Structure formats: structure tokens, C-alpha cells
UniProtKB/Swiss-Prot annotation:
Keywords: Fimbrium, Secreted, Signal. Adapter that links the pilus rod to the base of the tip fibrillum. Regulates the length of the tip fibrillum and joins it to the pilus rod. Pili are polar filaments radiating from the surface of the bacterium to a length of 0.5-1.5 micrometers and numbering 100-300 per cell, and enable bacteria to colonize the epithelium of specific host organs. One of its GO terms (cellular component) is extracellular region. The lineage of its organism: Bacteria, Pseudomonadati, Pseudomonadota, Gammaproteobacteria, Enterobacterales. Residues 1-21 form the signal peptide. Strains of E.coli that cause infection of the human urinary tract produce pap-pili which are hair-like appendages consisting of about 1000 helically arranged subunits of the protein PapA. These pili mediate binding to digalactoside-containing glycolipids present on the epithelial cells which line the urinary tract. The keyword Signal applies. GO terms for biological process: cell adhesion involved in single-species biofilm formation. It is found in: Secreted; Fimbrium. InterPro entries: Adhesion_dom_fimbrial (IPR000259), Adhesion_dom_fimbrial_sf (IPR036937), Adhesion_dom_sf (IPR008966), Bact_Fimbrial_Adh_Pro (IPR050263). The gene is papK. This is Fimbrial adapter PapK. Its main location: secreted.
Length: 178
């Protein structure tokens, strides 16, 4: 059916003596995805333990660190030996450079610090993990351990203005292989 319809259309165009031109667009996307992000690392939720707002009124004005891991798995053999860097991206809190901005009743009063894979260095949004060096893929999987904590802004500490209520922040991460 398709062949005969095509032949009929071709015949009609030739017999009318007109040429018809039309564009055909082709698109594609090539990815170099040597490792897959594990399902438990996609759309990850880091939940901070409930704390009294007054815990953020006095120095150091921060929560304990919550640990989390980004897991890479099913790394293709061509990935072994490559360096993978992970970069978190998100809106920074103006009063706490290098910290994520929170939304909710304490916006502008709290920020979220991300800790690098060494467990102590601040990992600023837009910078790559492991002090920019990344991590070498050495096998089929790789675990990247991070931490996060909530901290009051200097102004919120000074004025004791952190109040009870929910807060949240969102960051995305990007993986680059080289």
C-alpha cells in the first residue's frame, strides 16, 4: 500500500510538470555516559533531623552533618582510568557565599553547606568535588561520599531571627568525564 501510494504521488507530480521541494530535518544526541547513576542516587533527599530553632541562635549555629552518597554503577570498560568530576549546582545564599539558599520561613536566615568527599572541606556550588580533581574510575562502580549541614547566616545569629518552620533547598549535580 505504501509503495503504490508513493508511486501515485510521484506520477502526479511529474505529470503536473511542477517540482515540489520540502526539507527533512534530522536530529540526534550522542552521549558519553561511561557510568550510570544508581537509582537510589537519582532525586536524592537528604533529610535533616528536627532541631529547635534556638539551636541556630548561638554559635556555631549549625546542625550536625548528614552524610549521603552518590553511587555510579555499571561503568563501561572504556570508563576505567577516566576521571569523573561531580559538580553541584544551585542558588547560593547571598549572606553565606558557597552555601545553598533555602526557601521557606527562614529564607535569608539559613543556608545549606555541602561537604566535599574528604568530609570536611566546603564544596561550593559550581565547583568540582575532591578540590576540583575528581575521582578516577577504577572498576565497575564508584561511590562518592558527601555531607551537608544547615547553618544560620551571621545576621540570623546576631539577631536570633531563625524561627520554627520548614525549609528546603535544591541542588542538581552534573558528572563530567575526562
Amino acid at each position: 500500500m505504501i509503495k503504490s501510494t508513493g508511486a501515485l504521488l510521484l506520477f502526479a507530480a511529474l505529470s503536473a510538470g511542477q517540482a515540489i521541494a520540502s526539507d527533512v530535518a534530522f536530529r540526534g544526541n550522542l552521549l558519553d555516559r561511561p557510568c550510570h547513576v544508581s537509582g537510589d542516587s537519582l532525586n536524592k533527599h537528604v533529610v535533616f533531623k528536627t532541631r529547635a530553632s534556638r539551636d541556630f541562635w548561638y554559635p556555631p549555629g549549625r546542625s550536625p552533618t548528614e552524610s549521603f552518597v552518590i553511587r555510579l554503577e555499571n561503568c563501561h570498560a572504556t570508563a576505567v582510568g577516566k576521571i569523573v568530576t561531580l559538580t553541584f549546582k544551585g542558588t547560593e545564599e547571598a549572606a553565606l557565599p558557597g552555601h545553598l539558599k533555602v526557601t521557606g520561613v527562614n529564607a535569608g536566615r539559613l543556608g545549606i553547606a555541602l561537604l566535599d568527599t574528604d568530609g570536611s572541606s566546603l564544596l561550593k556550588p559550581g565547583t568540582s568535588h575532591n578540590k576540583g580533581q575528581g575521582e578516577k574510575v577504577t572498576g565497575n562502580s564508584l561511590e562518592l561520599p558527601f555531607g551537608a549541614y544547615v547553618v544560620a547566616t551571621p545576621e540570623a545569629l546576631r539577631t536570633k531571627s531563625v524561627v520554627p518552620g520548614d525549609y528546603e533547598a535544591t541542588a542538581t549535580f552534573e558528572l563530567t568525564y575526562r
